[in-house]
Amino acid sequence: MSESRNQRKVYQGRVVSDKMDKTITVVVETYKNHKVYGKRVKYSKKFKAHDENNEAKVGDIVKIMETRPLSATKRFRLLEIVEKAVIL
C-alpha cells in the first residue's frame, strides 16, 4: 500500500485562505514553456486541501498530497508545513 501512496501527486504552494473550518486554499505556481516563443510563462492553480487541525495560516508554504474526494471541491490533504509565514 505504501508504494501506491507514493504515486500520489504532491504539490508545494502558498496558503491564500484559511477562513473555512478544516479547509485551506493553496495556490501552486509553476512554469511552462510557450510553444512558439520558448519563453517560460508562469501560471498558478488553486487547490482546496483538508487541514484536520487548522494549523496552516495565510502565507505559510505547505505541501499537499492528492487523496480521495473529501467533498465537492476538496481532493488534497495537508502533508506538512514547510515554512511558517512571518507576521509583521
Swiss-Prot record:
InterPro entries: NA-bd_OB-fold (IPR012340), Ribosomal_uS17 (IPR000266), Ribosomal_uS17_bact/chlr (IPR019984), Ribosomal_uS17_CS (IPR019979). GO terms for molecular function: rRNA binding; structural constituent of ribosome. SUPFAM superfamilies: Nucleic acid-binding proteins. One of its GO terms (cellular component) is cytosolic small ribosomal subunit. PROSITE patterns: RIBOSOMAL_S17 (PS00056). Keywords: Ribonucleoprotein, Ribosomal protein, RNA-binding, rRNA-binding. Pfam families: Ribosomal_S17. One of its GO terms (biological process) is translation. One of the primary rRNA binding proteins, it binds specifically to the 5'-end of 16S ribosomal RNA. Belongs to the universal ribosomal protein uS17 family. HAMAP family: Ribosomal_uS17_B (MF_01345_B). Part of the 30S ribosomal subunit. This is Small ribosomal subunit protein uS17. It comes from Ligilactobacillus salivarius (strain UCC118) (Lactobacillus salivarius).
